[in-house]
Amino acid sequence: MSTLKIGICGWGNVATGLYKIAKKNIESIKKQGNLDIEIVVIGARRDNPNCKPENVIIERDIFNVVNHDIDVMVELIGGVDVAKDLILKALKKKKHVVTANKAVIYNHGDEIFACAKENGVKVLFESSVCAGTPIIKLLTEELSANKISKISGMLNGTSNFILSNMEDGAEFQSTLELAQKEGYAEPDPSFDIEGMDAAHKIGILSSLALG
């Protein structure tokens, strides 16, 4: 049985959620996929009280994560410039990269994918658009031989929640506060309500579908 060694960069809610799910499902993955998963190192500038990893190296300098013996780096720090530099460093060290960062793919996708190709590794970004819905795989594999002329859908959950409630008579501000309370919206919801989140997703999907 082969072992997939993973390094995680970032230690917020998404990263800790990934860690917990991976730990919980390790035996199932072994049985179904004939693959052992080992989280070797976590790049975390500070501790997260919601999750205390066990038997894992902690790097306070996230750029040191790719210096460890890992096969895959999972980038979950968010932002653009630092994330781009981190991803490029990992690719140049022949590490595969998984990211949920739509902003860095939207802004620097061409450079990132070119670097991955040059170094013979992959960049997987399914979760950057529509969370767990496999729209990226659908466009790049199942529908790759089809001519796509249009994509439509609900691309931003926060905006959809707010607009649906306003359609029923609710006020914008109170609905936004409810979305934040329920965890749909971030404490700073500007990317959602100003349309940047949806714009990044549209850019990624249109690039994949239309070239």
Language-model regions: role of each:
Residues G78-V80, S128, N156:
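Short glycine-rich anion-binding loops that position phosphate/pyrophosphate groups of nucleotides
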Residues K84-K93, K102-T140:
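Rossmann-fold NAD(P)-binding glycine/threonine-rich loop
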Residues H96-V98:
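A short hydrophobic/small-residue beta-strand
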